[in-house]
Amino acid sequence: MKTMSKSSLRLHFLSLLLLCCVSPSSFVIIRFITHNHFDGLVRCHPHKFQALTQFKNEFDTRRCNHSNYFNGIWCDNSKVRSQSYDYGTVSVELSNQTVASSSFIIFATLISLTTTSPPLPSLPSLFPTLRNLTKLTVLDLSHNHFSGTLKPNNSLFELHHLRYLNLEVNNFSSSLPSEFGYLNNLQHCGLKEFPNIFKTLKKMEAIDVSNNRINGKIPEWLWSLPLLHLVNILNNSFDGFEGSTEVLVNSSVRILLLESNNFEGALPSLPHSINAFSAGHNNFTGEIPLSICTRTSLGVLDLNYNNLIGPVSQCLSNVTFVNLRKNNLEGTIPETFIVGSSIRTLDVGYNRLTGKLPRSLLNCSSLEFLSVDNNRIKDTFPFWLKALPKLQVLTLSSNKFYGPISPPHQGPLGFPELRILEISDNKFTGSLSSRYFENWKASSAMMNEYVGLYMVYEKNPYGVVVYTFLDRIDLKYKGLNMEQARVLTSYSAIDFSRNLLEGNIPESIGLLKALIALNLSNNAFTGHIPQSLANLKELQSLDMSRNQLSGTIPNGLKQLSFLAYISVSHNQLKGEIPQGTQITGQLKSSFEGNVGLCGLPLEERCFDNSASPTQHHKQDEEEEEEQVLHWKAVAMGYGPGLLVGFAIAYVIASYKPEWLTKIIGPNKRRN
């Protein structure tokens, strides 16, 4: 075989999926092992075996972990079969190894080639060899350091079966030549520009140029590609569309992701087939177009962080994910949620909404996330929402809510799936019953990993791309106001701060094992800090400042290994601050305003003499134990003595009653 130049690829791992020509049972597994021989070869055709062996020998395996299959070459029939590859074809994925480009000459049936991060050096010798891969359909060269220009005579443009091409995150210096149009079977391409040559790619289904610095306007011709169903341009600097706002209407696009750009002006009219539209973090203005109500397949509408005005749309009942957060919307939340509504997320926080919560929300049996924080809603606590069986997040903070938050019967609150309840900065009053947190079954379970509230799947022949739309809330956490994402099943949090609540803090708070943040500050709570807080092993943030709490700080809090923030300042607490790393490492301000508190991190010492508080505590315990032992000794002597005394008296009374008369006297005996 003719030897070509030896410019190398440095690869993370190499996996070779080989389908031998005999039958599905003839798939092979080849692994690098200590003695450098093969294991598991099965009925492979001789020329296939020779090609595979030669390809394996191109690699430097001296630094491989030979016990790890992914540091070698392997073949997996299940993966080949699941990809529906035709017999006689091969798929290769390369990373962090060294291979001469001549290797690819032997694989005329290669259909998939991937060389991804960590970055590879410039590889001018790779492209000439590509013309030998006549059946190649997938080529992923993303996240490398390829440089230079793509010349018109590049063998890349001879891959007429190519359907998937990814060249993103490289250092190519040229624009795409017109020869790019020869790839007329291309369906998916990730680049850093919108080349005009794309006009000729009539089979293009998905374009993803996200996370780049592309500016300007989206070309009008893009929407005329007949099979295009996904456009992802998030995290760029686009500022508008060529043509009118009606340019998208007749497009076949189903998923349109415009988030985090510089778009201005009115929202575009959406395609009739749209499933998901995300345009958050832009500068869109005007009202939400009425045409949205005619897009019956719309499942995701994400318009957060814009400057939209006007009312909330009347037709959102069957949109699964609705995020209108941080706009300038006015009016009331419409009473138009119908029975059987499919809405799962409704976030209208940080607007100018007034009125009351719509009672038609009771029709939304799938509702999991409801956020109306930072508006001007004036209403009582929505106990009626307990009828929603899946409600997990409820945020009412910074509105004009008022009245009690305990049910009239003073029992448990009654939201079994609730994990996050934020009602801070309102005018809620009254006390919490001792059983208030008993029915929070979801928060009483241990933490689970969040898998995304609403996901859109974009399927293609090369895998499944998942776009996840996360819920976000503003939570005062560890003393800071922070925007939290991944909120649903990943943790539990309670924020009752800045209200007019009073009475004792219920011991039932200790049942919420998934609780990571508890904020009861700026109320009028009295009584002791619940000892049951020591049961909250996941707790990371605890704020009970500016109340009227008394007594001591529970010693069990020092055992909470995740507790990163605690504040009990400005109460009426006394005694020694528990001495544990998580507590003594806090700022002094977390404990100030309690005249009776002493010990680190405060400067006030708890004792005047040289003995430490711990030593005094031990001495007190020893004295108590000594007294208990003395009483035990007395009891041990008293019990048997009393028994013997009764026995002697019984014998005397039975057999010698005159002796008993002499001992106690006749008068005493008559009594």
Swiss-Prot record:
Using the UniProt annotation, give the residues that carry a glycan (glycosylation sites).
65, 96, 132, 153, 171, 235, 250, 283, 318, 363, 519
* Signal peptide residue numbers: 1-27
Membrane-crossing residue ranges in chain numbering: 633-653
**Where are the LRR-type repeats located?**
107-129, 133-159, 160-182, 184-200, 201-225, 228-250, 251-276, 277-294, 295-316, 317-340, 341-364, 366-387, 388-412, 415-439, 489-512, 513-536, 537-560, 562-585
Q: Which residues lie on this side of the membrane: Extracellular?
A: 28-632
List the GO terms this entry assigns under cellular component, sorted alphabetically. plasma membrane
Per the record, the domain of life is Eukaryota
Q: Which residues lie on this side of the membrane: Cytoplasmic?
A: 654-671
Alphabetical UniProt keywords: Cell membrane, Glycoprotein, Leucine-rich repeat, Membrane, Receptor, Repeat, Signal, Transmembrane, Transmembrane helix
Which Pfam families does its entry note? LRR_1, LRR_8
Recorded topology in the membrane: Single-pass type I membrane protein
**What is its subcellular localisation?**
Cell membrane
User: What name does the UniProt record give this protein?
Assistant: Receptor-like protein 20
**What species is this protein from?**
Arabidopsis thaliana (Mouse-ear cress)
